[in-house]
């Protein structure tokens, strides 16, 4: 995560933070490089609207960064997704549980003024569907954050679902309709 006031980056999930510190202290940066490469792929797949690749990469990150004891935990998934989008720090400001429209956006990646990338509105679901997440984003008018931030660029609505029985992730990505903006 990035604290705009202090201009510092931090990792909010304790398990991930400890693993990051261990990796850096031991000089073993191969895992860190792999995490950044996965993050680059994930961000690019999201922007390309490659739903299958996004679901696959999130599943990979979830398996690699969550202990079996906490695998079926919503907060663990949220932390994994935040960490998986690590590469976003170069082009985005991240917001969590941001009030917008008639509800709260789980995760918003708002591009910096220098970035030409689209805004990413991410809704997480548990034992539902990516389609249901997208429907919620539309019905709750999450795209209204654009008014608050005076953002006029493209917006991608991203719905990520995790099924606890199958341990599978699914993803739906849709451009917000221009007439809504």
What spans do the regions from the language model cover?
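Short, conserved secondary-structure transition motifs
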Residues: 160-168
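Arginine/glycine-rich "motif VI" loop of SF2 helicases in the C-terminal RecA-like domain
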Residues: 143-152
């Amino acid at each position: 995560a990035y604290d705009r006031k202090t201009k510092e980056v931090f990792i909010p999930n304790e398990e991930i933070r400890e693993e990051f510190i261990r990796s850096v202290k031991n000089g073993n940066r191969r895992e860190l490089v792999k995490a950044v490469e996965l993050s680059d792929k994930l961000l690019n797949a999201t922007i390309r609207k490659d739903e299958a690749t996004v679901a696959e990469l999130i599943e990979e990150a979830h398996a690699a960064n969550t202990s079996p004891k906490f695998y079926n935990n919503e907060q663990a998934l949220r932390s994994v997704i935040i960490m998986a989008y690590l590469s976003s720090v170069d082009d985005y400001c991240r917001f969590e549980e941001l009030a917008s429209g008639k509800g709260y956006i789980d995760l918003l990646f708002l591009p910096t003024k220098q970035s030409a990338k689209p805004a990413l509105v991410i809704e997480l679901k548990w034992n539902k569907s990516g389609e249901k997440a997208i429907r919620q984003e539309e019905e709750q008018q999450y795209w209204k954050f654009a008014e608050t931030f005076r953002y006029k660029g493209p917006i991608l609505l991203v719905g990520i679902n995790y099924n606890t029985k199958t341990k599978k992730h699914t993803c739906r990505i849709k451009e917000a309709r221009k007439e809504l903006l």
